[in-house]
Amino acid sequence: PYLGQLPSGETVLSYESSSKYTLKIGDATARNFGSAYQPFSGGYWGSFCIIDSHTLVGTNIKAKEGPVQMAQFVLNHRIDAVKRKVTIDGNNKEWANTDHALFVGSKSQAQGTLRCSYDDDNIYFLLEVLDRNLLASDYASLYVSPVSNNKLSKGACCIQVTMNGLKNCEIYDASWKEAQLDAQVKTYVCNETNERLIDDYGYIAEIAIPRSKLTITSGQVLVNFSITKRNSLDAICDVASTSTARWIPAVSYTHLRA
């Protein structure tokens, strides 16, 4: 077995179980661990290396004298919102690389990150989508929920964006219903016609949601994030479920006062 600890405190354990490489995430004392994750089909003698605060690389030998399997894994956990004024123009210049981010992108070449900021009037979100085959029908969905009893409740909202801008806004009231949130959305497509590329191609989306439209409790909201490409959906948490138990807290050190 291999055991490591990320800077944020989470411990990572890797071991072989029934000839499968297995990972578990544990608490800071390495005493309590979550469910097992088995990313490779089989093999033996696996190990991992922590790359940075949110990334590790796991390796495993497929079979005797076979190829080495290797994969990168990204940790999604609570993100801290930075207080700043953001101009909604599709330019990410106000945002810093050190901002906490959530990551989606295990099912296809399309990947996305989500960051959060706020000021006295709005909560801001930055979506950066890397996609080398971007289609007008592809979209990203941002879900925001009050901190409640682990269930979707009135006050939750969903904003969908494409590379061309706002696609749809919905609020939750027993079911998802189209609504006006007064959200501002601006996108910027990154391709061979400009210099602001995200690695190769993709788009940037900046979103501002008025604080008056959200229910903020003790400086927190819960967020979920998904990207949809050619009807294939990749998300942090199951978007069809009404449970928010695994949604990610977005937290302000100074509290996002409602």
What is each residue range found by the language model?
Residues K154-D200:
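Glycine-aromatic-enriched beta-strand/loop faces of beta-sandwich-type recognition domains
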Residues L3, L13-S14:
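Hydrophobic strand positions within the blades of repeat-based beta-sheet folds
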Residues S18-I25, K64-Q72:
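Structural motif
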Residues G9-L13, H54-G58:
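Entry beta-strands of beta-propeller and related beta-repeat scaffolds
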Residues G90, N122-V129, A205-I209:
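Short, well-ordered beta-strand segments enriched in hydrophobic/aromatic residues
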Residues W45, G66, A71-N91, T98, ...:
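Acidic/polar low-complexity flexible segments
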Residues N32-C49:
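Conserved blade-ending motifs and adjacent loop-strand segments that build the rim/top face
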Residues L3-P7, F48-I51:
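Structural signature of eukaryotic scaffold interfaces centered on beta-propeller domains
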